UniProtKB/Swiss-Prot annotation:
Name of this protein: Ribosomal RNA large subunit methyltransferase H
Key words of the record: Cytoplasm, Methyltransferase, rRNA processing, S-adenosyl-L-methionine, Transferase
Keyword ATP-binding on entry: no
Top-level taxon of the source organism: Bacteria
Length: 159
């Protein structure tokens, strides 16, 4: 199984890079994990609604190029479904049973995701109503993916 994490913007903070690297190493026992960082568009000060839409559209084009035709796509969006870790684990296991070999998670840029990407997604997922930095969300999601595999395995990691 392959798990892709497509992110808009470059990861800057060393502690986040280190945390993600640790979970990538742990995930290598269960799947081929790939994090794809895409260039984000600069958002001008006092950007108009039209400016924001254009920025999200450009980012969506970059995202779309990295999604495989047969990928099961989960886009992170505030309006998405929320799951406890156990249900998330079942979801990941269920995707492979349905015949998908790749699960692709998408984290948009600071403006969010364009509707085209949300429509392409097989599922919208939310980690709640809190606003978190997109870079921190990468670490949180990577840990939850690892946790999902550990739950499936029956490991005491998830207590």
């Amino acid at each position: 199984m392959k798990v892709k994490l497509i992110c808009v913007g470059k990861l800057k903070e060393r502690y986040l890079k280190d945390g993600i690297s640790e979970y990538q190493k742990r995930l290598s026992r269960f799947c081929q994990f790939e994090m794809i960082e895409l260039t984000d568009e600069r958002t001008p000060d006092k950007a108009s609604f039209a400016d924001n839409q254009l920025i999200m559209s450009k980012e969506a084009q970059r995202i779309h190029k990295k999604i495989g035709e047969r990928d099961f796509v989960i886009a992170l969006a505030i309006e998405g479904k929320q799951f406890p870790s156990e249900t998330f684990s079942e979801l990941i296991s269920g995707v492979t049973v349905k015949g998908y070999s790749t699960i692709t998670f998408i984290i948009g840029g600071s403006l969010g995701l364009d509707s085209i990407i949300k429509k392409r997604a097989d599922m919208l997922m939310s980690f709640g109503l809190l606003t978190l930095p997109h870079q921190l969300m990468r670490l949180v999601l990577t840990e939850q993916i690892y946790r999902a595999f550990m739950i499936t395995k029956g490991s005491p990691y998830h207590k």
